[in-house]
Amino acid sequence: RVMDEMKDVVFELIFVDDGSSDATLGIMKDLNEKDSRCRYLSFSRNFGKEAAIYAGLKASEGDYVALMDVDLQDPPTLLPEMYEILQEDGYDNVATKRVTRTGEPRIRSFLSESFYKFVNAISKTEIVDGARDYRLMKRKMVQAVLEMSEYNRFSKGIFGWVGFRTKWLQYDNIERSAGKTKWSMWKLFKYSVEGITGFSVAPLSLA
């Protein structure tokens, strides 16, 4: 539906399979056979969200690149508005953030809010509370992100660090269309530690 609305835009769709154990790879192969605009990358095992983001960005070829989760918690219907903003308003990047956490467990909401408060208190790079990875970027920003050579990447911090002009769009949290999240509390904790160590000098000062 979104692609029909944006008829003047040539799309390429890149799906990244992060070592899934279900039928994801087969579905991606079928999509590729039916529509040459659909491409896919498949990891040999689960390397994590950051590796998937980097691989997808590196494989992209377009002048504009959107990052989006396939669970539809990132509403595709925002894409036309995001694209129009980049055409008219002089921004390099349209990012999104949730203004509610409807459907999310309270303990997870509390820990997420605490993380953002803590990391922003000790970091020179602002990481917006509720920020999603869902965004539309111009090619020059994509190239700058790819040139960041961190081994343990933290994209939410990198997007702010590279310094391009950003427009924020807000939306209410949307529950997953299917399946369950694979983000356990332990994985979230490890990801938070990577974010803190990657974008502040405080942990090094305390060591």
Predicted regions and their residues:
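Alpha-helical bilayer-embedded segments of polytopic membrane proteins, i.e.
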Residues: V193-A207
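Short, well-formed alpha-helical segments that are part of the catalytic scaffolds
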Residues: R1-D4
